[in-house]
Amino acid sequence: MSNLYESIRKYKCGYIEEILNILDMFDPLLNKFQRNSCYEDMKSELSLFMFNLIDNFPLEKDCFKEDKFIINYIYKALKNKFIQVNKLHQKIKSCESNIDIVALNNCDYSNLLSFVIFEDIIKDLTQNEKNIIRKIYLDRLRESEISRELNISRQAVNKTHLRALEKLKKLIN
C-alpha cells in the first residue's frame, strides 16, 4: 500500500486520479461489506460515501500523518456508514412488507399511504400501546371490546390509550 497520506493530499490538491488509487486500496474492505449485506448496492453506496469522506478528510490534524491512523479512521467511518445503510434498508424492507400485507387486503392507495404514515407515527410507542392504538383507530374497536379481548380492565385500556396519545403529542411537538 503506497503512502495514503500523500495520496489524499495529492487528491485534495487537484490530482483527481488519486481517488481511484485510494478506492483501490479499500476495495477488499468494500467487497467485505458488500458480502455481509443483503443490500445489493452497498458497495456503490460506500464508494460514494468514501468520495465525501476523502473530500472532507481532516489532513491538518497531526495524528493523520501516519497511514495506520488514516486507515483506522476510514475503516470506522465505513463501518458506521455500513451499519446506518443496513438499518435504513431493513426499515425500508419492513415498510415494504407492511405495504404488501395491506395491499393483499385490497386497500386503495390513500388507505395504504395512511397506514404507512400511521405506522411511522406510532413506531416509538411500546408494543402494548401500539396494539391498543391500532385496535382503537384501525380496527375501530371500543375500549370495552379491547379489554375483553386482552383480558384486562377497561380502565387499563383507557389509561394505556391516554398515555400513548400523550407520548405521540410530545413526539409531534
Curated annotation (Swiss-Prot):
GO terms for molecular function: DNA binding; sigma factor activity. Residues 143-162 bind DNA. CDD domains: Sigma70_r4. Pfam families: Sigma70_r4. Residues 122-169 are annotated as: Sigma-70 factor domain-4. GO terms for biological process: DNA-templated transcription initiation. Keywords: DNA-binding, Sigma factor, Transcription, Transcription regulation. InterPro entries: RNA_pol_sigma-70_dom, RNA_pol_sigma70_r4, RNA_pol_sigma_r3/r4-like. Disulfide bonds: none annotated. Sigma factors are initiation factors that promote the attachment of RNA polymerase to specific initiation sites and are then released. Transcriptional regulator specifically required to activate expression of the toxin gene locus, composed of tcsL, tcsH and tcdE/utxA. NCBIfam families: sigma70-ECF (TIGR02937). This is RNA polymerase sigma factor TcsR. It comes from Paraclostridium sordellii. The lineage of its organism: Bacteria, Bacillati, Bacillota, Clostridia, Peptostreptococcales.
